[in-house]
Every structure is written in C-alpha cells, then in structure tokens.
Amino acid sequence: MAKFEGYSEKQKSRQQYFVYPLLFQEYIYAFAHDYVLNGSEPVEIFGCNNKKFSSLLVKRLIIRMYQQNFWINSVNHPNQDRLLDHSNHFYSEFYSQILSEGFAIVVEIPFSLGQLSCPEEKEIPKFQNLRSIHSIFPFLEDKFLHLHYLSHIEIPYPIHFEILVQLLEYRIKDVPSLHLLRFFLNYYSNWNSLITSMKSIFLFSKENKRLSRFLYNSYVSEYEFFLLFLRKQSSCLRLTSSGTFLERIHFSRKMEHFGVMYPGFFRKTIWFFMDPLMHYVRYQRKVILASKGTLLFQKKWKSYLVNFSQYFFSFWTQPQRIRLNQLTNSCFDFLGYRSSVPINTFLVRNQMLENFFLIDTRMKKFDTTAPATPLIGSLSKAQFCTGSGHPISKPIWTDLSDWDILDRFGRICRNLFHYHSGSSKKRTLYRLKYILRLSCARTLARKHKSTVRTFMQRLGSVFLEEFFTEEEQVFSLMFAKTTHFSFHGSHSERIWYLDIIRIDDLVNPLTLN
C-alpha cells in the first residue's frame, strides 16, 4: 500500500491551479450556456426549459455571490425553496442550473491543462496511460488465446460523494473550488450516509449532467489507474529471441523493450519484454481481468482487490461477486456477446520416409456468438414475435405508409447485424432476420387485408433488398470472385465496428414503436 501511495504521489500534478475566481466571470456562464445549446444530447436549458440566456440574471448571480452570507445561508437552510434561498422558483432554478454548469466548466480546466504536457517532460501524466475503450477488440482477438483464467468485475458505484471530492484533490489544489463542490453534493444528497438508493444520484445527474459526468469519469480514471499500477507490479521479464517474431502476437506489442548484443560467432540480439501476468480491459462499468497464471495466483489477486477497494475507495466489495472462470471451460458475456475459448482437436497425418504418423493437435479458438434467448426476448417484448420466436404482425404500425414500415423493420435488422458483426457464428442473426422479415410481411399484409404470400410476390426483390445488411455488402465485395458463396453459410469472419460501444443493450434499435 505504501508503494502505491508513493507511485500515486509521483503522478500527481504539482501545479497550483486557482480556478475559483473564474466563477465570478460572466463569460464562463456564457460558455456553459453555449455548451448546452450545442451539446449532442438533448438537455434541459437554463431557467425551466427557457432557452434564452439572460445576461442580467447572471450579473445578479455574481453580485449575490460576492455577499459574505451568500453561501452561509444556503448551507444553513438547505430545506428552503431550491437553491440560493430565493423566494421566486424561476430565479432559484435558473441560479442552481447555471451555477452548476459554470462550475463544471471551471473544474475541468486543470484536467485540460494537464493534457497539454511539455515535450521535455519525461513523466507522462497518469490519465494518458489509460487505455481507450476501443482496445477491447484487439485485446480479445490477440490476448485471450494465451490466457487461462478470467474475472469479471463491476466497478462499484455509486460511492460516497466525499470520496469523489477526495479523488479530485490529486489534481485540483484550489480549496474554495472543492468546498463549492461539496456544497453542490450536500444539496442533492444526505451528507451523513452512504448512498444506497439511486434517487439522489438520479436527481443530481438529471439536473447537473456535465458535472455528474465529470465526477464519474474522474472516479473511473482513478479506478483504472489503480488497475494499471497493479498490472505493472505483476509484470516479469521474459527472454524472447528475435526468431520468435514470426508469431503475430509479437508484432502488435506496445511495451518498452531493450536489446542486448552478445559478442560471438553469430552476434545474435536478445530481447527482453515486460510481459504482464495480469491483463485488464474496461468497458462501461465493468472490468475484465485475465491472467495466464495459476488458480492460486488468481485467488490472491481477488483477495488483494477486495482489500484495496476497501482501503482506497472506502467501499466494501463482496468477494463472492468476483467470479473466477477458466477460459477453456466456461463462457462469459460482454457487450451483449457470449464468448468462449474452446479447445479444438485436429488429427494431422504426417509421413516420414515410409512411416505414417497420426498427430493429435489441440488448438484454442476464440468464439463470439449473439445470445439467442435474450435477443428473441427483446423482439418479443417489442411485439415482433411470440416468446418462442414465432413471428407476428405489429398492429400499431399499420397506420404508417408502406415505405415507413419497410424502413423501420429494415433499420432494426441492420442495427442488429451491425452491433453483432463481431460474431463468429451468424446462425442466431439470420434467425432474427427471418423473424423481422416475416413480421414485416405480416404487418403489411394485415394493413392491406391480404395474405403474406401474395404481398411478398407483389414486392419481390424490393422487399428482400431492404433487409440486405451492410455487413453482407462487405462480404459480397470480399468474396466477389467466389462462385459458390452463400451469405447464409457458416462463415466465421468477424468485423468489429467501434461505434457499438455507444449502444446500450440494444435498447435504441428496438424501441421504435
């Protein structure tokens, strides 16, 4: 623990950023208002859905902030109407929202300045050592075949708001800003208890989206920094000859190495790689820890994680919630995929002179599939099929035009194929495609009071092209010269689209009714 504290202290920002005076500048709140208007997500604008920015109200807010008893009255009377002890609900709502958004912009400044590191600096800031979430795909493709055990951990959240403030003290040395942050958090939660209900978190996140997102990202950054430290401590030097670079895994390494030239007849270069015993990757609120060590090594890691989380984050983690799975004997779920690393056996016949040998070869293979039961359950909940997967019509869409009905069904099908394009087995996806296609045909037939066969004969190829997915177009270009290629075959090529991390449990593609 002392070693981690020393490592963390070394990575802290040494500069003193005094950002509190910026809260008294009018242009800060203009920036906050401009951010809300131009944001990618629909949010409520200042002043109870009033999209007009009032410079006069901002000036009044700054004048009130200069008063000596401004914050004292707000803290001592938290049960009065909204924030800032104002009798008018409109002014109180406006002041609360605009002050929160302005503070969120101000508190982000030390983190933005830390990213602009000087070229002569040797130490890299710790947030630049963290991995991109897109690294999960090469991690699964390149690393998993060489690992033995896996642990699926959910990042503990929510935690006490005081822990979030203490984490920000690593890079924000401005004490008044931290006190102001405590004031905001004290207003939206019970300060003397651990947050176990999501009511206060939801209220705070809804009214302070930028500030709540900043706090959560800071917390996840510290949690991942802790995993990065543990990963570095578990690394070992492994001797690797230059001849082994024929393996693909060594080409994709992004770790520091050094070469030592030994004098001799052949003058061969020997490389030393920092080979970590523990690998991790994070996505959403989950962390995957995988190791090539033994089961005893994994159990020690599990105990260490539980104790460290309790000490550093003051959060109790139940040990039974961290499950240890052997990759070759179990499946695991991530991002809506069901994955496994089975061992396939191949019988190879070799001939040496006049003798024949049968060699039993065992190879690992990384398989990803789309889980059929949850996806069919989602389609059933959206009233596209029954619980057993039998397609039915969707009466609520019969008032739409034929083109809108085709477009909606085709869009859902393309989104499903796009999200699960990384599956090595497409059987489940083609089953979902059949359900959506027949449900679309029955919906159109019900609208025109006709039979399904008659309507499909009338549409012909137009109906089929609407369900021709983007992934199949890619494969048609790849295998244009193949004569006997079928899209409904068992091809196992995977295409990972990096934008699928923005889709949460396939809710968006299915809620079109």
Swiss-Prot record:
Signal sequence residues: none
Record localization: Plastid, Chloroplast
A Pfam family of this chain: Intron_maturas2
A GO CC annotation given for this chain: chloroplast
Segments traversing the membrane: none
UniProt-listed PANTHER family: MATURASE K
Described purpose of this protein according to its UniProt entry: Usually encoded in the trnK tRNA gene intron. Probably assists in splicing its own and other chloroplast group II introns.
Family: Belongs to the intron maturase 2 family. MatK subfamily.
Cross-referenced HAMAP family: MatK (MF_01390)
Record's protein name: Maturase K
Annotated source species: Astrebla lappacea (Curly Mitchell grass)
